């Protein structure tokens, strides 16, 4: 048995990874409850604010692969500390911004720190865990950004703003301090001799050119298949997550009711991410992937009937199940693909998220554009169901 499998300290490291991912979710969502006050203070239009909020995914697409290379060279300890530091710097820079351009670049900076944790987390888990425990570990760490986002939504206006005398800049400084403190905690945990020794086994020596690594990975059919599915999964998740409150509001709900109902998939997703990935052993992974994608497609279809509580509840539960586990199972499949492994997990993760975030950008834009053209979200929801059908055809080709 490998050293990482014997050591109970791997769970301590997993807690550190979870903390960094929590900082990711906290900072990513932090501006959403502050949009109104920031827009008023800086004199921004809704369009300008939308452009600012979309700055980091654009940078993410370009930076994911270089970040994956850096992670393979530097290792998870250094990379995840850098991630927390950049996330903290992004939050602090937002607090100092005094115009549209400054805020745009502050948010864009998050797109460099984000990939380091998104890619670094599965690489570290692939080092320290195997089999069902690896799937459980992935399910645990993916709850970090979800809970970080929930905390940002729940506490920014109810606690942080009153505590900071209503100053949104000071709130962002607070979140920057939390993120940096988390980075220091991670660095301390990852400096344990056992962690340092195991990490050294996964750091590439630079003998193989990274261009060759990229090409070798893309030659693997399972990798190409997973990348295509990742684009579809991010298209679905980002598209529906961004527009769900508005879909519910247009079905007749108040803004408060829509917010409550829209939180259901997040809560279900946390439970799903803890339970389902550990069941996705190699022999069952294809069947579970098909079931998750089918759940996503059915959820989009049921949301056509958001005015009726029964199909709405079923749709939101199914969305939460798919949202919590779909990407985790895909990432698990990728890192366990022959020819990838722990040594190239960073580079493979960089390719994965570079491809996936293309769907993440196109999803919200497409649903919004279709809504403008048709006057509603029905066509967009049908499109999501259709994409899920195509993903099922791809998932069937996954080999156990």
Task: Enumerate the language-model features and the residues they cover.
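Residue-level signature of mid-helix packing/kink "hotspots" within the transmembrane helices
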Residues: 29, 57-65, 150, 266-274, ...
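Extracytoplasmic gate region of multi-pass secondary transporters
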Residues: 31-32, 221-263, 269-273
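Helix-loop-helix hairpin linking two adjacent transmembrane segments in secondary transporters
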Residues: 140-191
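C-terminal transmembrane helical hairpin of 12-TM major facilitator-type secondary transporters
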Residues: 284-333
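Cytoplasmic membrane-interface "Motif A"-like loop-to-helix N-cap segments
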Residues: 73-83, 281-293
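Conserved MFS/SLC helix-loop-helix module at the cytosolic interface between two early adjacent transmembrane helices
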Residues: 62-98
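A late C-terminal transmembrane helix in Major Facilitator Superfamily
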Residues: 341-374
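Cytoplasmic helix-loop-helix junction between adjacent transmembrane helices
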Residues: 106-144
């Amino acid at each position: 048995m490998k050293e990482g499998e014997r050591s109970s300290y791997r769970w301590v490291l997993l807690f550190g990874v979870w903390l960094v991912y929590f900082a990711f979710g906290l900072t990513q969502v932090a501006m959403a409850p502050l949009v109104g006050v920031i827009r008023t203070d800086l004199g921004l239009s809704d369009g300008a604010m939308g452009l600012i909020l979309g700055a980091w995914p654009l940078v993410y697409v370009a930076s994911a692969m270089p970040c994956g290379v850096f992670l393979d060279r530097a290792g998870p300890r250094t990379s995840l500390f850098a991630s927390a530091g950049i996330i903290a710097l992004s939050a602090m820079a937002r607090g100092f911004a005094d115009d549209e351009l400054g805020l745009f670049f502050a948010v864009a900076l998050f797109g460099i720190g984000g990939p380091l944790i998104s890619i670094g987390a599965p690489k570290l888990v692939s080092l320290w865990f195997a089999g069902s425990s690896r799937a459980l570990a992935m399910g645990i760490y993916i709850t970090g950004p979800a809970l970080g986002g929930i905390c940002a939504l729940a506490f920014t206006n109810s606690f942080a703003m009153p505590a900071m005398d209503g100053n949104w800049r000071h709130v962002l400084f607070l979140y920057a301090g939390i993120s940096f403190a988390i980075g220091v905690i991670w660095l301390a945990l990852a400096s344990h001799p056992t962690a340092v020794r195991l990490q050294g086994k996964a750091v590439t020596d630079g003998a193989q050119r990274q261009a060759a690594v990229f090409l070798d990975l893309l030659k693997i059919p399972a990798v190409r298949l997973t990348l295509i599915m990742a684009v579809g999964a991010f298209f679905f998740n980002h598209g529906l997550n961004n527009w769900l409150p508005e879909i519910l509001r247009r079905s007749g709900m108040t803004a408060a009711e829509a917010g409550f109902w829209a939180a259901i998939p997040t809560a279900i997703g946390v439970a799903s991410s803890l339970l389902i990935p550990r069941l996705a052993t190699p022999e069952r992974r294809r069947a579970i992937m098909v079931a998750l994608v089918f759940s996503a497609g059915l959820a989009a279809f049921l949301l056509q009937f958001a005015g009726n509580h029964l199909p709405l509840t079923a749709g939101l539960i199914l969305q939460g199940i798919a949202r919590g586990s779909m990407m985790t199972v895909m990432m698990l499949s990728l890192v366990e693909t022959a020819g990838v492994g722990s040594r190239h997990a960073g580079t493979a993760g960089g390719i994965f998220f570079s491809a996936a975030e293309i769907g993440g950008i196109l999803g919200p834009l497409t649903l919004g554009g279709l809504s403008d053209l048709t006057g509603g979200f029905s066509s967009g929801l049908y499109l999501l169901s259709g994409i899920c059908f195509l993903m099922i055809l791809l998932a069937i080709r996954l080999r156990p």
